[in-house]
Amino acid sequence: IIPPQTAGRIAIDSGLAEGDWCPVKPESFQSTKAEHVYVLGDAAIAIDMPKSAYSAHSQAIRVADHIVADLEGKTVGDASYRNTCWSLLAPDDAIKIGADYTPGRLPGNREGLVASNAFVSKPGEPAEERKATFDEAFAWYPTLISEIFAKDNARAGAAKGRS
């Protein structure tokens, strides 16, 4: 079963959406509909960034930086985001695709996120490279969880120091 592909009901009912998704400022993921509201991950119109957990994590870091800077009366440097998606093909065999993203102009003079440094696995890659990609895919989730919950996480420690 594939769930409805839209922003959550709360975002739509709150007037944050245009159609099924929420428009955001690419440099911050701040809503274009409501000041001091940030929308990230699947709910955001993050043209041309894919909707993935990796993307949402990258966006969340930026949103946290903006919220902290706003509370401290500071500014945040230039935005950059990253995405990687892995596909597991068999034990010890995986492929990946990804890119870096920065705010900019897209075709049709639309504001969005412009991809750079794109990468994609190639047909015929050596087994060692596919194994390394497989290992990378499995390392990502524990790394993410460690970043979020680690006691020595500098970002979390800084946030606790302000409370």
What are these regions (language model features)?
Residues 1-2, 34-38, 62, 70, ...:
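Broad hydrophobic/π-residue packing in well-ordered secondary structure
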